[in-house]
Amino acid sequence: MFRAQCAALCLVLAALTSCAAPGARAAVLSISPADTTVQVGATFTLRVTCDAVSDLKGMQTAWGYSATRLQLVSMTAGNVFTDGGGAWFEHMIFDVSAPADTAWLDVAKLNGTAQGPGVAAYVRFKALVPGDAPVQCTLAEMRDSDNVSLLPGCSGGIVHVAAPTAITRRSWGQLKIHAR
């Protein structure tokens, strides 16, 4: 009797796992480059990349950053959603709580689906003061055309903001004397 119950339970579990959505699989979002150095005052762009996804309909993502070191300029949809024809929608959600330290983006393919790998979003920052500024994933949600979550994982990065180095002007003769 006990063996029959175990066998029945195993059959039910096997049936449930085989009935799961076939397109649903874990996806990964990551910041690229994961480690970069910029100068104070520079405006630069980080890419939010996604791995191979065959059926991507929409994404909501949020990335936390150091508001003392970085200022968010913009966050826009990447080529995963914008290339390949078809209409798409994007909406940058502004962080209204002080300090503004989160970049949010909703993006969806309106007709058809998107495919990865590629750039899912571009995040543009301005470097404010020297130091290390981690960029961390605080929210990642990706859905396929059946509205099934792709259960995305995500990994952040770090931006090293460097202070400008002073340039000393010397003539060739001064350099020769200084080097001796």
Which residues does each PLM region occupy?
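Positively charged n-region of N-terminal signal peptides that target proteins for export
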Residues: 1-8
